[in-house]
Amino acid sequence: MYKTIDLFSGIGGIRLGFEKYGCTNVFSSEWDKYARQVYEANFGEKPFGDINGIDPSDIPDHDILLAGFPCQPFSIAGKGLGFEDTRGTLFFNIAEILKTKQPKAFLLENVKRLTTHDSGRTFRIVLETLKQLGYTVYFKVLNTLDFGLPQKRERIYIVGFSDNIPFYFPEPINQYRPLGELLENDRDVEPSYFLSDTLKQKRLAALKKAPPTPSIWHENIGGNVSALPYSCALRAGGSYNYLVVNGVRRLTGREMLRLQGFPDDFEINIPYSQVRKVAGNSVSVPVIEATRKICSLLFPARSNKKGNWIYWRQDDA
């Protein structure tokens, strides 16, 4: 049984993906009160608050560290591209825990922009820090659209092992569920979700071609409207208001969580405005599930006749 900790946990999407494969979570941390409220309702425990308020040595021993950490700039005073450059950021908390607890593996998730942030310097510091801590590190940008969900959402995933273990990221399945399977019937949606006739006509007039059905309409800052058979990336900020189902209504809270791969029995116990935020900040569960091979790689699966350990490889999937 593998033990995990869930840092910057949000509503628990990473944990959910790993628990499906037998992992037991022993510690969680999240500062947003609404995300903590949802997390407690679904996992039976309230995450620790601000990670800055806990000593890394007080965190339980674990095999895998899981974290979806914020993208922050590092100090321009740093010259070494390493651990000391990360002080004052939330990534430093992750590095401190890795240094203190030395788990066998980690999975980190971040926005794709991390790779180019500060002309790539931020990402170089992250990778160098992890390597300085003794980990073999792998990274890749994965798109939710390639793993079964109708949402175009690119995120960087960073995997590390304390041993020199070969790792291969999952290959895209190159298909996704039809959008219509995730949308609720308009007849079952409350009237408050529907747009006024004026807004509907405005967006319809901005379309350059006939929309597919069903579709999610996205209006960018410039006022251009596109209608797609999948959703653009769910976002926590105000731009989220520009995603409209078939040009007539907003996404419901349940639809948002479905677009992130959460099951329908996942409880929603916070206001709609906060559901938009926590859903936009969450991870896509199927992408996390696709990285489950981390568990298989942690410990030798079997030995061959010569006594050498054989590890799970990509072609064993």
UniProtKB/Swiss-Prot annotation:
InterPro entries: C5-MTase, C5_DNA_meth_AS, C5_MeTfrase, SAM-dependent_MTases_sf
Record's keyword annotation contains Methyltransferase: yes
CDD domains from the UniProt entry: Cyt_C5_DNA_methylase
Molecular function (Gene Ontology), one example: DNA binding
E.C. number(s) listed in UniProt: 2.1.1.37
TM region(s), chain numbering: none
UniProt key word Transferase: yes
One Pfam family named in its UniProt record: DNA_methylase
The protein's enzyme class: transferase
Gene Ontology BP term (one): methylation
Keywords for this protein: DNA-binding, Methyltransferase, Restriction system, S-adenosyl-L-methionine, Transferase
Catalysed reaction, written as an equation: a 2'-deoxycytidine in DNA + S-adenosyl-L-methionine = a 5-methyl-2'-deoxycytidine in DNA + S-adenosyl-L-homocysteine + H(+)
Domain of life per record: Bacteria
Domain called SAM-dependent MTase C5-type: residue spans: 2-302
NCBIfam families given in the database record: dcm
Family classification: Belongs to the class I-like SAM-binding methyltransferase superfamily. C5-methyltransferase family.
Protein name according to UniProt: Type II methyltransferase M.NgoBI
Species of provenance: Neisseria gonorrhoeae
Lineage per the UniProt record: Bacteria, Pseudomonadati, Pseudomonadota, Betaproteobacteria, Neisseriales
